[in-house]
């Protein structure tokens, strides 16, 4: 039954709707400006500036929502607007969105503002956008000066090499390329290596998204090759190979490699999108099966991703019958974790009380999760979705889980109309806990898991992250085989840690003591003491010492800390370095002039 009013008679309703949309438009303008600034910072190789920009953009959305709430409270006394007017506000807002190019994001912004003003009893489709109201299908920016979402190129006309060069140069990057002809040759060789010689069909074409995707020290060209009935995804990372010179680093042609680049364990891209839904639709065609929620999140629209995820959860609950259960594995001291077996995510709640030796607070743990959200995750830390007032049907909760919730988090629970409302929780992708992966794995799987674990921790330390609790149970294995850290309550910046060696025992009593004979400060770390916790299984020990014997040396950790303190930002690659053109085709690079060679300027080609 439709409860909406027949007439839109409220001027306040229209004014509030218009004010909310104006505030959203301001938010999205700032969002796009960040992507434009990212291109400038990338061209200057200002990596610290790019990091700062990415951090600031993450908090920008909440700032704009709060500004809008304050305006509505000050100018319209929003909390006291009656129900009929609130319904009209939504209808007016829908009317204002009919020609909008980011309607789905504007609807989410509307929800965010309303959730700050209205009681949760109003969280229905009468008052907020539980379901989308405006279609985003075939949405494009048709203004004459606007860039299309993607450009189509036809190699049959000019040849593949010339087409590839035009694709790169159309992005008009300011620094010249070290040797673009060489790089295009590498791209063509990689295509041949992957597919062999293939016959060009009449519809042979290449589609390329019109904006670059910026993250870390790379700018990615993302597109698809169409040939007959085949759709082949690709991404080309562009990197600074030496001061003032660019190069195409590799060509990623496999769908699984693109899915890793757009993974939940990586930081969000900075990408300028006039019509974000069109970008997401394009990305869905090259990564079928990847949820739209994750794609929206990966391109920096994490609130839209969060909104879509919640809709996916509600949809799944209405089309499934299994129960939420306590997550398998070792129970944590700080978090209560549960899952729905038919849904590939885990739900994490901060407990009301923590047993010794944990010395922390709810506020400190929430700040750790925010630290991870703001930090460069490098594909090694799981992203989290943070929710308030999540209502789950009591009938879908296992009895053991309900007892555990009532025991561990009573302050966060409310019973309401057959639902259990959880006041605060985090949601993450479900992974195989690394301790179980190693415990049950074959020799090959153990070697892979241990090698990945060491690589993950080493990459995190280079990114200024000390995990705190190094146990395998705090790491997970993704469906792509990547080892990812997901327990953040003890996380610290490595630069805040004091890396120490264990001093030699003073006497035999010290040597036999089960307690440290030396003082340990709150930020002291002793890498050589990690062995007993990580190397108990002989099979694990053998491969750990084969690949990561230096893991337990304080000098490794101190060297990373020293470089960070000197302002160095190391290179990270979300793909195996063996795929880099310089590694894959070394003969093509042997003749490249050195940066100091007088011929280098002649070989440099400007992408303009």
From Swiss-Prot:
This protein's superkingdom? Answer: Bacteria
GO biological process per UniProt:
glucose metabolic process; glyoxylate cycle; tricarboxylic acid cycle
Q: What does this protein do?
A: Bifunctional enzyme which can phosphorylate or dephosphorylate isocitrate dehydrogenase (IDH) on a specific serine residue. This is a regulatory mechanism which enables bacteria to bypass the Krebs cycle via the glyoxylate shunt in response to the source of carbon. When bacteria are grown on glucose, IDH is fully active and unphosphorylated, but when grown on acetate or ethanol, the activity of IDH declines drastically concomitant with its phosphorylation.
Species per Swiss-Prot/TrEMBL record: Burkholderia ambifaria (strain ATCC BAA-244 / DSM 16087 / CCUG 44356 / LMG 19182 / AMMD) (Burkholderia cepacia (strain AMMD))
Task: Give the location in the cell.
Answer: Cytoplasm
Q: Which HAMAP family does this UniProt record tie to the protein?
A: AceK (MF_00747)
Which residues are listed for ATP binding in this entry?
327-333, 348
Active-site residues, Swiss-Prot/TrEMBL: 383
Q: Does the keyword Phosphoprotein apply?
A: no
Family that this chain belongs to: Belongs to the AceK family.
Q: Gene name?
A: aceK
Name by which UniProt lists this protein: Isocitrate dehydrogenase kinase/phosphatase
- Reactions mediated catalytically: L-seryl-[isocitrate dehydrogenase] + ATP = O-phospho-L-seryl-[isocitrate dehydrogenase] + ADP + H(+)
Print the keywords alphabetically. Answer: ATP-binding, Cytoplasm, Glyoxylate bypass, Hydrolase, Kinase, Nucleotide-binding, Protein phosphatase, Serine/threonine-protein kinase, Transferase, Tricarboxylic acid cycle
Which GO terms of the cellular component aspect does the record hold?
Answer: cytoplasm
What EC identifiers does the entry list? Answer: 2.7.11.5, 3.1.3.-
GO molecular function, a single term: ATP binding
């Amino acid at each position: 039954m439709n409860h909406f009013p027949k007439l839109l008679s409220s001027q306040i309703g229209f004014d509030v709707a218009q004010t909310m949309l104006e505030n959203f438009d301001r938010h999205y303008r700032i969002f796009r400006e960040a992507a434009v600034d990212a291109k400038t910072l990338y061209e200057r190789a200002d990596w610290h500036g790019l990091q700062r920009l990415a951090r600031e953009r993450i908090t920008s959305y909440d700032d704009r929502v709060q500004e809008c709430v304050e305006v509505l409270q000050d100018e319209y006394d929003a909390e006291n607007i009656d129900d009929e007017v609130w319904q009209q506000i939504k209808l007016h807002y829908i009317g204002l969105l009919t020609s909008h190019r980011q309607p789905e994001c504007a609807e989410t912004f509307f929800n965010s503002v309303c959730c700050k003003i209205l009681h949760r009893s109003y969280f229905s489709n009468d008052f907020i956008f539980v379901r989308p109201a405006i279609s985003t299908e075939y949405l494009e920016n048709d203004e004459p000066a606007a860039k299309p979402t993607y450009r189509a190129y036809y190699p049959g006309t000019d040849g593949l090499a010339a087409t590839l060069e035009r694709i790169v140069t159309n992005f008009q990057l300011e620094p010249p390329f070290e040797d673009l002809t060489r790089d295009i040759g590498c791209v063509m060789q990689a295509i041949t290596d992957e597919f062999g010689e293939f016959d060009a069909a009449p519809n042979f074409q290449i589609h390329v998204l019109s904006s670059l995707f910026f993250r870390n020290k790379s700018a990615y060209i993302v597109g698809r090759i169409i040939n007959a009935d085949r759709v082949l995804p690709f991404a080309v990372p562009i990197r600074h190979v030496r001061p003032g010179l660019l190069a195409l680093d590799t060509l990623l042609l496999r769908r699984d490699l693109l899915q890793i680049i757009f993974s939940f364990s990586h930081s969000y891209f900075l990408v300028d999108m006039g019509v974000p839904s069109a970008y997401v639709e394009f990305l869905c065609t090259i990564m079928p099966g990847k949820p739209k929620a994750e794609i929206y999140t990966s391109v920096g629209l994490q609130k839209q991703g969060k909104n879509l995820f919640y809709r996916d959860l509600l949809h799944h609950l209405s089309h499934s019958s299994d129960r939420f259960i306590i997550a398998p594995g070792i129970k944590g001291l700080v978090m209560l974790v549960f899952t729905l077996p038919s849904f590939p995510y885990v739900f994490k709640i901060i407990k009301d009380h923590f047993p010794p030796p944990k010395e922390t607070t709810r506020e400190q743990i929430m700040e750790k999760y925010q630290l991870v959200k703001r930090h460069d995750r490098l594909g090694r830390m799981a992203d989290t979705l943070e929710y308030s007032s999540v209502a789950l049907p009591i009938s879908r909760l296992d009895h053991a889980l309900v007892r555990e919730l009532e025991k561990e988090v009573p302050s966060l629970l409310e019973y309401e109309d057959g639902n259990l409302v959880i006041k605060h929780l985090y949601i993450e992708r479900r992974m195989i806990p690394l301790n179980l992966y190693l415990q049950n794995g074959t020799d090959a799987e153990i070697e892979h898991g241990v090698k990945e674990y060491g690589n993950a921790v080493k990459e995190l330390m280079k990114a200024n992250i000390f995990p705190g609790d190094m146990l395998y149970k705090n790491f997970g294995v993704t469906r792509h085989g990547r080892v990812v850290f997901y327990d953040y309550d003890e996380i610290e910046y490595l630069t805040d840690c004091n890396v120490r060696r264990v001093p030699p025992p003073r006497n035999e009593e010290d040597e036999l003591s089960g307690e440290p004979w030396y003082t340990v400060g709150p930020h002291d770390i002793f890498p050589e003491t990690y062995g007993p916790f990580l190397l108990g299984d002989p099979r694990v020990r053998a491969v750990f010492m084969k690949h990561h014997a230096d893991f337990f040396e304080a000098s490794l950790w101190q060297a990373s800390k020293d470089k960070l303190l000197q302002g160095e930002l190391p290179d990270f690659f979300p793909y195996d370095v063996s795929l880099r053109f310089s590694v894959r085709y070394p003969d093509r690079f042997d003749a490249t002039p050195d940066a100091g060679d007088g011929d280098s300027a002649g070989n440099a080609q400007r992408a303009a």
